[in-house]
């Protein structure tokens, strides 16, 4: 009978009541009521058991058997030693896990163990090494509403990093952009603000962690409020351990190049829709340390706007360019993840091997310091403090790389460190030798060839004899346990040896645990120095990664433009070029933009000619420049850009009821409402999601508006509306096109950008090579010829009226003309201009 069918029976409810009335289940329920939103891992011996609704949820996610305790209580369980794999799967499903451990009997003679929740693991609070994704950051966000501002904190508990910032309630795009960069695996909001955030469009399908305790502070303490919420959540999830976060970094507006979420996605900086390969990050990540890899990703997502920072990075690169990098790279490979090691030390999750990793890191760091001093590289590590830590650890740590994963499962402290420890180890070794010797003697004395002496944690040491020979056991054997195929015994001599071994083990465990804790405390005294060391290592690794990319791909050092112009000579797309098949070369292109006469390039050319690639490579070269990297070009002179916008491609947001065109217009509006004179804007096919004339009118209006500005943002405007090329007569606008070559019935896309405008779109040819059936392609060609012929006839008729026809008069009424003349275009936003244009259009249609 399954669970559903029994749930309606009186017998089931009676059995359930009885089952829940046991001391153990009463204990479970008492603990569970304090952690209702978690799956409770209830330790019972060598297993974590889950009961009731927790069991149903966990068994479904983990694909493990759901059974019933006393025929009523749903339950499932996992071995304690393999919990990480199961916890990881639950976290990926968005669940929280409360780890409830057993310690000692509740009272003398009681079978019920004392149990307490020692840790709550949530998606954003993971610090356990086996649950983290390699070197990747694991962020948690806290949002806090205060009047008209949203304050937010982004923290990685595994590294201790914290970032603070704030945005206006009306400027949510920046908040969304920051969340897109950090991609927090958990977002926390105060209980009183939950409804506000839940109703925002971006968060509609997002689960929040609701912070129950409301923190009251003054108006000026908003960042302090975030700090208190973070610390409160640490106490709640880590249960009174020493985990602390570092000093926060402020993400102030203007310090870094701003990119909205569409730009981050369109440029595929650190991931694309399908994978994390073939991105800007993946192709020039040559870092050898975890810190270096994280730092490279951060700097790609937060390019600098301060030229002083860029010059500092270039100076370091210039020093390294004069040296051989191979020895530095070899040394960097020995570095452990110091940030996470320190976090594990604070969070009571340290491993013995962490000390070996720390020791190797310090040793390599000291060697690097000596080598880099020879070339005057500013490698500012606290050398004296590091030597103190190294000496302290070396005095104690067992040499070699065979340290145990878990304390107690092998040798941790070196021989000679403690006389008492050495004696206990010797006694333990002798005791085990005595066991082997006793087994040999007992086999010979009894003549029982199935006799073996074994050990487990529950029974201890025992003599095991098969059931067939058990009756022949000597009288001095004391029966200990009966199994299906064997009997287990003990004897006075074995018990004596066992006491010796167990006493020795207790001494070893006590000394090693005490010294382990002391070593952790000593290392934490130098945590500030170690974090500074980690930062220097990460920055060196970052610089060497940039130099490696330069050598591998043939990139060059860009120059800073003093006049705000952008000048790329034979630039290339870094990702496309790096992923081309062997023997295939990327065709380079040049571009020049300024803020006056050459500010706005109208880019035309057929589909597949390379318009989007060209625009993306400009953006990626700009980003590489502003992180201090080399760029793929023959030469480059680039400005500091404060905001980078891309409107490339659009997909329906059907879940929000938004069409392709609406999404396109929202993105366009965001750009036109937030650009500055120092922005770089890349528009691709604006207006294609609606009718031809509507779309062209909008695109035309945008270009006119940008042209009318006294200082124009640098803009590339790719379009299929060839009529827009006529706007080159306006100030600041010029034409570019992708060159093609017609050869018999073929079209060659030459991928070369030239000054001027494209002659054809070649859409029918693209349809043909895409596999559209031949009859359809043929008919399309006929229709195109017909339409183009009519278009020419209309133009001729408009240009040369006959003697027998009167010229057509434009029936604008005086009121409309007067309204147009009164418009103050310089005071109108682009959206207001579009709305006014739409109103005039409606009036003219009514006149017709």
From Swiss-Prot:
Q: What does the UniProt keyword field contain? A: ATP-binding, DNA damage, DNA repair, DNA-binding, Nucleotide-binding
Matching entries from PROSITE patterns are given as: DNA_MISMATCH_REPAIR_2 (PS00486)
Query: A Pfam family this protein belongs to?
Result: MutS_V
Reading the lineage from the top rank, the first entry is Bacteria
Binding annotation for ATP:
605-612
Q: Which SUPFAM superfamilies match?
A: DNA repair protein MutS, domain I (SSF55271), DNA repair protein MutS, domain II (SSF53150), DNA repair protein MutS, domain III (SSF48334), P-loop containing nucleoside triphosphate hydrolases (SSF52540)
Cellular component terms (Gene Ontology): cytosol
MF term (GO), any:
ATP-dependent DNA damage sensor activity
Q: Which InterPro entries match?
A: DNA_mismatch_repair_MutS (IPR005748), DNA_mismatch_repair_MutS-lik_N (IPR007695), DNA_mismatch_repair_MutS/MSH (IPR017261), DNA_mismatch_repair_MutS_C (IPR000432), DNA_mismatch_repair_MutS_clamp (IPR007861), DNA_mismatch_repair_MutS_core (IPR007696), DNA_mismatch_repair_MutS_N (IPR016151), DNA_mismatch_repair_MutS_sf (IPR036187)
Q: Which GO terms describe its biological process?
A: mismatch repair
Please describe what this protein does: This protein is involved in the repair of mismatches in DNA. It is possible that it carries out the mismatch recognition step. This protein has a weak ATPase activity.
The UniProt entry's sequence similarity note says: Belongs to the DNA mismatch repair MutS family.
| Protein name stated in the entry | DNA mismatch repair protein MutS
* Phylogenetic classification of the source organism: Bacteria, Pseudomonadati, Spirochaetota, Spirochaetia, Leptospirales
Gene that encodes the chain? mutS
């Amino acid at each position: 009978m399954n669970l559903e069918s029994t749930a309606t029976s009186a017998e089931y409810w009676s059995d359930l009541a009885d089952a829940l009335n046991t001391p153990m289940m009463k204990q479970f329920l008492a603990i569970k009521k304090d952690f209702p939103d978690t799956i409770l891992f209830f330790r019972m011996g060598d297993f974590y058991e889950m009961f009731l609704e927790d069991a149903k949820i966990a068994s479904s996610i983990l694909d493990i058997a759901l059974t019933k305790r006393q025929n009523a209580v749903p339950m499932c369980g996992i071995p304690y030693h393999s919990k990480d794999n199961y916890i990881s799967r639950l976290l990926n499903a968005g669940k929280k896990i409360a780890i409830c451990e057993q310690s000692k009997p509740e009272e003398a003679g009681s079978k019920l163990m004392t149990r307490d929740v020692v840790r709550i693991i949530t998606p954003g609070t993971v610090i356990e090494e086996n649950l983290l994704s390699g070197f990747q950051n694991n962020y948690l966000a806290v949002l806090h509403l205060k009047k008209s501002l949203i304050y937010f904190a982004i923290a990685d508990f595994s590294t201790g990093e914290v970032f603070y910032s704030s945005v206006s309630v009306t400027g949510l795009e920046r908040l969304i952009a920051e969340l897109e960069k950090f991609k927090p695996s958990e977002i926390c909001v105060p209980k009183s603000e939950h409804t506000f955030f839940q109703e925002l469009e971006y968060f509609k399908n997002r689960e929040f962690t609701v912070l129950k305790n409301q923190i009251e502070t003054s108006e000026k303490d908003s960042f302090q409020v975030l700090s208190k919420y973070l610390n409160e959540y640490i106490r709640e999830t880590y249960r009174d351990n020493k985990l602390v976060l570092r000093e926060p970094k402020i993400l102030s507006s203007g310090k870094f190049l701003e990119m909205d979420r569409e730009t981050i996605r369109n440029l595929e900086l650190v991931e694309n829709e399908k994978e994390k390969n073939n991105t800007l990050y993946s192709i020039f990540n040559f870092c050898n340390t975890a810190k270096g890899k994280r730092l490279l990703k951060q700097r790609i997502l937060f390019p600098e706007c301060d030229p002083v920072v860029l010059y500092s990075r270039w100076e370091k690169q210039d020093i390294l360019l004069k040296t051989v990098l191979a020895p530095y790279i070899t040394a960097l490979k020995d570095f452990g993840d110091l940030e996470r090691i320190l976090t594990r030390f604070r969070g009571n999750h340290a491993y013995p091997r962490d000390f070996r990793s720390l020791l190797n890191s310090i040793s390599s760091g000291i060697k690097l310091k000596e080598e880099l001093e020879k070339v005057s590289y500013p490698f500012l590590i606290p050398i004296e403090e590091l030597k103190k830590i190294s000496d302290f650890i070396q005095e104690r740590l067992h040499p070699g790389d065979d340290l145990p994963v878990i304390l107690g499962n092998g040798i941790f402290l070196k021989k000679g460190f403690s006389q008492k420890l050495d004696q206990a180890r010797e006694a333990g070794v002798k005791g085990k030798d005595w066991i082997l010797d006793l087994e040999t003697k007992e086999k010979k004395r009894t003549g029982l060839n199935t006799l073996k002496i074994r050990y487990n944690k529950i029974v201890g040491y025992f003599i095991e004899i098969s059931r067939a020979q058990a009756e022949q056991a000597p009288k001095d054997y004391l029966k200990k346990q009966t199994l299906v195929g064997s009997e287990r015994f003990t004897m006075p001599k074995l018990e004596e040896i066992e006491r010796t071994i167990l006493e020795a083990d207790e001494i070893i465990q006590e000394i090693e645990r005490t010294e382990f804790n002391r070593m952790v405390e000593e290392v934490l005294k130098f945590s500030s120095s170690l974090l500074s060391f980690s930062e220097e290592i990460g920055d060196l690794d970052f610089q060497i990664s940039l130099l490696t990319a330069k050598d591998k791909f043939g990139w060059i050092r860009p120059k800073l433009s003093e006049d705000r112009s952008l000048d790329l000579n034979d630039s290339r797309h870094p990702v496309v070029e790096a992923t081309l098949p062997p023997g295939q070369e990327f065709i380079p292109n040049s571009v020049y933009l300024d803020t006056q006469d050459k500010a706005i390039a109208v880019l035309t050319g057929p589909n597949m000619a390379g318009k989007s690639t060209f625009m993306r490579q400009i953006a990626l070269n700009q980003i590489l420049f502003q992180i201090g990297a080399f760029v793929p070009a023959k030469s480059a002179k680039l400005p500091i850009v404060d905001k980078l916008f891309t409107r490339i491609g659009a997909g329906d947001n059907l879940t929000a009821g938004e069409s392709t065109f609406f999404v396109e217009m929202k993105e366009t509006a965001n750009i036109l409402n937030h650009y500055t004179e120092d922005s770089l804007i890349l528009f691709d096919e604006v207006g294609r999601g609606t009718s031809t004339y509507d779309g062209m009118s909008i695109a035309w209006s945008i270009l006119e508006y940008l042209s009318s500005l006294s200082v124009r943002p640098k803009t590339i405007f790719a379009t299929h509306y060839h009529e827009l090329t006529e706007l080159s007569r306006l100030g600041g606008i010029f034409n570019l096109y992708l060159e093609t070559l017609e050869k018999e019935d073929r079209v060659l896309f030459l991928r070369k950008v030239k000054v001027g405008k494209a002659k054809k779109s070649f859409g029918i040819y693209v349809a043909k090579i895409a596999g559209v059936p031949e009859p359809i392609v043929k008919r399309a060609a006929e229709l195109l010829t017909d339409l183009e012929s009519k278009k020419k006839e209309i133009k001729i008729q408009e240009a040369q009226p006959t003697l027998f026809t009167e010229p057509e008069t434009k029936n604008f009424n005086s009121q409309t003309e007067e309204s147009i003349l009164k418009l103050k275009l310089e005071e109108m936003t682009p959206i207001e201009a579009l709305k006014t244009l739409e109103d005039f259009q409606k009036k003219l249609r009514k006149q017709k």
